[in-house]
């Protein structure tokens, strides 16, 4: 229910019933953290107040505005540079439907692609570069559409969708060669799964804190922006028209059915407030042969700390294995 007092959401939880057509268990709801990690700035009070009013008097206008905000990646100032010891890579690019995707490459050997998450950029997975190069791989990291140096897609500059991000992943693999492995974070994992389901050649997958079920994020988005069911329903419809499919069909469990189930290591922390750990448990349970590595103690910044967590990095590199084997 929208808050007429215009208070910030604060530390509160939402419980989302998982009894939906894809077989979720209503006795075990997903718990959503409204405040999140705090890395992104809170929604401005004037925006929350505007959505509260639009929910009552003009939900169609509110849903149009919400759709544009949803498709706008946040600007996060963390990890703007590669880690120490990682030199500038060889510049490269790929194109899809005339849109340019910008990246860099290091080393020689079988290809491993690094795919950042929503609002990220290619340095975010930079801790994987040195050990993967040392194990005999050529490593390619790139920026998703409307992120950092890459062009926007069909939407206005500064906006994109998960489907456009998947197009970028598929274009990179198509242009530069089959992936011995892909290491992907958050929305980048979903984009990678989509690319694999479309036929991109992927040998092994390392997913860090993936966004397992997209519809649950509408609940979080509504709570953070202070709108209710009318705007949310309009946002849902508009997003489905924009991406050309049901939001339920963007759930990782459903996407995976068309990937051929390549070997998967999924790494996640139960403290992650941005992507629910429970959804990763369900992905692994549905993915034959998949392994779940549970990190501990990364706190409210777990969604981002996992990218620098040495046990997680070591596990991912070992799962991929040396290139000569």
Can you name each region flagged by the protein language model?
Residues 122, 129-152:
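Conserved alpha/beta-hydrolase
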Residues 157-180:
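Alpha/beta-hydrolase active-site loop
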Residues 183-192:
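Gly/Ala-rich beta-loop-alpha elbow adjacent to hydrolase catalytic centers
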Residues 273-279:
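Conserved alpha/beta-hydrolase "acid-adjacent" motif
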């Amino acid at each position: 229910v929208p808050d007429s007092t215009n208070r910030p959401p604060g530390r509160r939880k939402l419980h989302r019933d998982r009894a939906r057509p894809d077989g979720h268990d209503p006795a075990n709801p997903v718990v959503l953290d409204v405040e999140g990690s705090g890395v992104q700035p809170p929604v401005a009070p004037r925006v929350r107040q505007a959505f509260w009013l639009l929910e009552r008097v003009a939900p169609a206008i509110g849903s149009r505005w919400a759709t544009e905000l949803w498709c706008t990646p946040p600007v996060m100032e963390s990890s703007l540079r590669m880690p120490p010891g990682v030199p500038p890579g060889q510049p490269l690019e790929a194109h899809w439907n005339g849109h340019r995707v910008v990246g860099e490459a290091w080393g020689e050997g079988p290809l491993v692609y690094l795919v950042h998450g929503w609002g990220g950029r290619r340095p975010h997975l930079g801790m994987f570069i040195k050990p993967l190069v040392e194990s005999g791989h050529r490593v390619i990291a790139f920026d998703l559409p409307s992120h950092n140096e890459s062009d926007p897609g069909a939407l206005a500059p500064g906006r994109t969708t998960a489907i456009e991000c998947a197009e970028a992943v598929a274009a990179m693999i198509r242009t530069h060669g089959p992936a011995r492995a892909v290491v992907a974070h958050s929305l980048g994992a979903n984009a990678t799964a989509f690319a694999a389901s479309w036929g991109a050649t992927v040998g092994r997958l390392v997913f860090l804190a993936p966004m397992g079920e997209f519809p649950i994020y509408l609940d979080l988005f509504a709570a953070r922006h202070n709108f209710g069911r009318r705007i949310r329903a309009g946002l849902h419809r508009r997003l489905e028209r924009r991406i050309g499919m049901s939001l339920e069909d963007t759930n990782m469990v459903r996407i995976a059915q068309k990937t051929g189930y390549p070997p998967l290591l999924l790494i996640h922390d139960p403290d992650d407030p941005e992507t629910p750990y429970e959804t990763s448990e369900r992905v692994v349970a549905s993915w034959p042969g998949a392994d779940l590595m549970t990190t501990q103690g990364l706190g409210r910044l777990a969604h981002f700390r996992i990218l620098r967590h040495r046990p997680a990095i070591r596990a991912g590199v070992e799962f991929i294995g040396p290139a000569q084997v």
